[in-house]
C-alpha cells in the first residue's frame, strides 16, 4: 500500500462503503497515535496534539484547516491552550472512509513539520 499521507482524498458519495474493520486495522498501523472512537453511533478517528502554548496550537489548527480546504474533507477541530484535538470521519456515510485515514496521516505529517 502507498503511504497514506501521499494519497489524495477521493470524491465520496452517500452510498460509498465504510472501511471494513480489517482494513481499518491495517491503515491504523500507519497512524498508530490515532484512536477509533464512537460518537452517537458514528466511528471516528481522533488524536490530541500537544503544543507549548496557545499560539502554536492555533497555528496548527489553521494549517489543518488549509489542508482540509485543499483536500475538500473537513475535520472537527477542538482548540485549547496547548492542545488541538483533530477528529476525522465522513459525514456522508456516517462513519470511516479511506479519506479519513489519508487525512489523519497528512495531519501527522503537518505536526512533524
Swiss-Prot record:
InterPro entries recorded: PCD_sf, Pterin-4-alpha-carb_dehyd, Pterin_deHydtase
Highest taxon of the lineage: Bacteria
Similarity field: Belongs to the pterin-4-alpha-carbinolamine dehydratase family.
Name used for this protein in its record: Putative pterin-4-alpha-carbinolamine dehydratase
Annotated GO MF terms: 4-alpha-hydroxytetrahydrobiopterin dehydratase activity
HAMAP family with a match to the protein in the record: Pterin_4_alpha
EC number from the UniProt entry: 4.2.1.96
Amino acid at each position: 500500500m502507498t503511504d497514506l499521507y501521499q494519497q489524495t482524498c477521493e470524491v465520496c458519495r452517500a452510498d460509498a462503503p465504510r472501511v471494513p474493520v480489517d482494513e481499518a486495522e491495517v491503515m491504523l498501523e500507519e497512524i498508530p497515535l490515532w484512536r477509533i472512537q464512537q460518537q452517537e453511533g458514528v466511528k471516528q478517528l481522533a488524536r490530541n496534539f500537544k503544543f507549548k502554548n496557545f499560539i502554536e496550537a492555533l497555528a496548527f489548527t489553521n494549517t489543518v484547516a488549509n489542508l482540509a480546504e485543499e483536500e475538500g474533507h473537513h475535520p472537527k477541530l477542538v482548540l485549547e491552550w496547548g492542545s488541538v484535538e483533530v477528529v476525522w470521519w465522513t459525514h456522508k456515510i456516517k462513519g470511516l472512509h479511506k479519506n479519513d485515514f489519508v487525512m489523519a496521516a497528512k495531519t501527522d505529517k503537518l505536526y512533524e513539520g
